[in-house]
């Protein structure tokens, strides 16, 4: 069950990275374990390529608080979102 979410639409890479880090830290403090991070499909970016989608996956790998992540189901955002499981 998704307990919290953030939406990175409209953010540049550095802003998004900082926002994700703060969000994950806050969720950890609050005991939240399952979150959705909406990064978008990249349709509004230059060359219509997903910039944040690929960077987000790289950032999540580096976070000790993250156990696992996967692309969201279609009804939860599909290719435009990631579901993240955080440590207790």
What are these regions (language model features)?
Residues 1-34, 38-88:
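Long, charged, low-complexity intrinsically disordered regions
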């Amino acid at each position: 069950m998704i307990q919290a979410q953030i939406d990175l639409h409209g953010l540049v890479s550095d802003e998004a990275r900082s926002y994700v880090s703060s969000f994950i830290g806050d969720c950890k403090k609050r005991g939240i374990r399952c979150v959705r991070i909406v990064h978008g499909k990249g349709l509004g970016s230059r060359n219509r390529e997903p910039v944040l989608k690929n960077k987000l996956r790289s950032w999540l790998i580096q976070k000790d608080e993250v156990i696992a992540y996967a692309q969201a189901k279609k009804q939860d955002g599909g290719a435009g979102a990631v579901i993240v499981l955080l440590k207790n």
